[in-house]
UniProtKB/Swiss-Prot annotation:
The keyword Ribosomal protein applies. It holds the Pfam family Ribosomal_L10. InterPro entries: Ribosomal_uL10 (IPR001790), Ribosomal_uL10-like_sf (IPR043141), Ribosomal_uL10_bac (IPR022973), Ribosomal_uL10_bac_type (IPR047865). This is Large ribosomal subunit protein uL10. Belongs to the universal ribosomal protein uL10 family. Keywords: Ribonucleoprotein, Ribosomal protein, RNA-binding, rRNA-binding. One of its GO terms (cellular component) is ribonucleoprotein complex. The keyword RNA-binding applies. Forms part of the ribosomal stalk, playing a central role in the interaction of the ribosome with GTP-bound translation factors. One of its GO terms (biological process) is translation. GO terms for molecular function: large ribosomal subunit rRNA binding. Part of the ribosomal stalk of the 50S ribosomal subunit. The N-terminus interacts with L11 and the large rRNA to form the base of the stalk. The C-terminus forms an elongated spine to which L12 dimers bind in a sequential fashion forming a multimeric L10(L12)X complex. It comes from Dechloromonas aromatica (strain RCB). NCBIfam families: PRK00099.1-1.
Length: 165
């Protein structure tokens, strides 16, 4: 059953709202995936804060027109699942991880920072650590010298106390 005009307008408005806040869009072909597997993928996407939906390509073309993602329109052919995320890495990571365990999901393309990415580009983007991981590594690197200095001072103080006693 097809969508009527009002439903189509609502879908375009919903997708446009998601795209307005997005940094990354990744598209993949989902031919032959079982419903249970697709449900697992949707759950992982929800947990990662990724908008994941199977949509008509023409509606998505309208939603991304006049945005940084408009160049993806050339890749919108066939049965596709769209992954949209405000986190630059999350959308690519969710689909790429799922594609590793399910060979029926084929990554097609993606767009990040106004550039269209091919399958290899999407996989490279997925391999980048998330923002939280990068911040925790940066914090560790910044804390390590200070923590070492404090331990050295504590050891020096303990040594002087022993010498004084």
């Amino acid at each position: 059953m097809g969508l009527n005009l009002n439903d189509k307008k609502a879908v375009v408005a919903e997708v446009s709202a998601q795209v307005a806040n997005a940094q990354t869009i990744v598209i993949a072909e989902y031919r032959g995936i079982e419903v249970t597997d697709l449900t697992v993928l949707r759950k992982k996407a929800r947990e990662s804060g990724v908008y994941l939906r199977v949509l008509k390509n023409t509606l998505v073309r309208r939603a991304v027109a006049d945005t940084a993602f408009a160049a993806l329109a050339d890749h919108m052919v066939g049965p596709l699942i769209y992954s949209v995320s405000a986190d630059p890495v999350a959308a690519a990571k969710v689909l790429s991880d799922f594609a590793k365990s399910n060979d029926k999901l084929v990554l097609k393309a993606g767009s990040y920072a106004g550039k269209v990415l091919d399958k290899a580009g999407v996989q490279a983007l997925a391999s980048v650590p998330s923002r939280e991981e990068l911040l925790s590594k940066l914090l560790y690197v910044m804390q390590a010298p200070v923590a070492g200095f404090v331990r050295g001072l504590a050891a020096l103080a303990a040594q002087r106390e022993e010498a004084a006693a």
